[in-house]
């Protein structure tokens, strides 16, 4: 958005916003009192958060009712404002002196049904069907990534567990990310740079001149080298055991400076066709320093998905990068793929995914801070069965 804007040389960009309370525009009521507005766009089921600080030196600011809905738009004067969603007020603070009112609102109403404990079981269904059913009973619209929607779920229990926690557990097992944004329950493929409908998110390019601060760190090389998951089922009465290893297939690009020494590509090897074992263990990576998932899964397929999801998460965390943009970018969201330039080669050559966006706005400025992780592009796997 902003990198495509043109404005007169020497002109000054002025931050702008619009705030609506239950569909009523209250921008004019607070414009002279606004001290700061902070909007945090989080990945996953950590709700997006809106913090507004208002000057109440004269004691005339009315405290909003918890449960009220705020809709916020931010950007720059002279350009179209970007809607950042609806937020439910769940905290109000008053402090002094000088007196200040802080209003805190979140994208999902965690005082509502999403956070209520439930009992239930799901049989012979799919991941997409479960997500849609939960969305419906929470008055949300479901949007599930096609690659996840068709995953078969033979049986799973929801015992004294909120829908929020249950969905998070499903996401962790199947390599997804779940969140609530703009009245939609989103179930995405984690770190792939695609929307819930499967469309690719346009890549954003950020140069060093766009920011005024950055931080880069490579994780400990002695971290986990693999993940194991166990399964146990009774379809085959034979007391067979099977151990399955997961390794990455070779791909054209993989930044060696960020590549774990135990995550190197290997030659493709076809596994012999054998009946699925009644019980077994599945390993992603190498056995030197293994993270063992404690859950025992019902099938080999479930164990494989869980191990792959955890292994991918560990690989995405091999490096971290953050940057503060001096000129705010209201058009940037989490899961957006990013290429950067002007930094060290090891940073510039890596593909990145945004995991957190923080917009800070007041009457004199608008900045955006980004947190990014390594993007796993077009990752494919091969398996080896050890009898």
From Swiss-Prot:
Please classify the protein's predominant subcellular localization into one broad category: virion
Region Disordered, as annotated, extends over 233-275
UniProt lists compositionally biased (Basic residues) regions at 240-254, 263-272
What keywords sit in the KW lines? Answer: Late protein, Viral baseplate protein, Viral tail protein, Virion
Which GO cellular component terms are attached? virus tail, baseplate
Location of this chain's protein in the cell: Virion
Q: Do you know which SUPFAM superfamilies this protein is assigned to?
A: Phage tail proteins
Q: What induces it?
A: Expressed in the late phase of the viral replicative cycle.
Transmembrane helix as a keyword of this entry, yes or no, is no
Q: InterPro entries, per this entry?
A: Phage_Baseplate_Hub
Q: Specify whether Transferase is a keyword of the entry.
A: no
| PANTHER family recorded | FELS-2 PROPHAGE PROTEIN
Q: How does it assemble?
A: Homotrimer.
Give the family from UniProt: Belongs to the P2likevirus baseplate hub protein family.
Briefly state the protein's biological role.
Answer: Putative baseplate hub protein.
Name the chain's protein.
Answer: Probable baseplate hub protein
Organism the protein comes from: Escherichia phage P2 (Bacteriophage P2)
Q: Which gene encodes it?
A: D
